[in-house]
Amino acid sequence: MSAPALELVSVGRDYPGGVAALADVSLAIQPSELVAIVGRSGSGKSTLLNVMGTLDLPSTGSVLIGGTDTRSLDDRQLSSLRGDTIGFVFQSFHLTDGLTAEQNVMTALLYGRTPRRQRADRAREALHRVGLGARLDHRAQQLSGGERQRVAIARAIVTDPLLVLADEPTGALDTTNGENIMNLLETLNSQGTTVVVITHDRQIADRLPRRIELRDGHLVADSSGAAAHV
């Protein structure tokens, strides 16, 4: 049996002043799963995203990506692991307006192992996967909100990551575009991509096959049947 795409073991994250943003969180996400992590504002979702994505280190416990314990890695190795195995999608897109859709997607390949001559081909392939094959040369500011988020998703998947972390991916979109983005994430998952959606919206969470709930930094529910405790 293959290792989980992502595993957290007794993870805690404390901030100065004794504020516990996460407390004893344990979970495992298997390859090709589609998972919602849901909670209200202040529940610890953003901190959990940062810890899962190795953007922040836990105060206690361990984070394993594809079976690799991140505690054993130095900063350079951790950055390399993140770039090779994790794709991020953020609510605010994080695109560069002066660049085309293709160029924005190519930025994800600048520091990886993809040869320069292959980067444009990889970017175009990713944009075709998200339905933007006709928008390759459009600059980011010329795209609609839904199209901009599709570019962001293409950038997240262009490295063929083990895991995609989507933080409130519909938060800046209207209902129709938000529905289209969720349909796209579900399609990518059906093609084998492991997707974790972080959201405050229970309607979004309820449409996904597995739901993990956070409250005050604790994992309090997991629809997979895994133990949850406060």
Whereabouts are the PLM-identified features?
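ABC-family P-loop ATPase nucleotide-binding domain
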Residues: 1-13, 221-230
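ABC family nucleotide-binding domain
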Residues: 4-214
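H-loop (His-switch) and adjacent beta-strand-loop-beta switch element
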Residues: 211-224
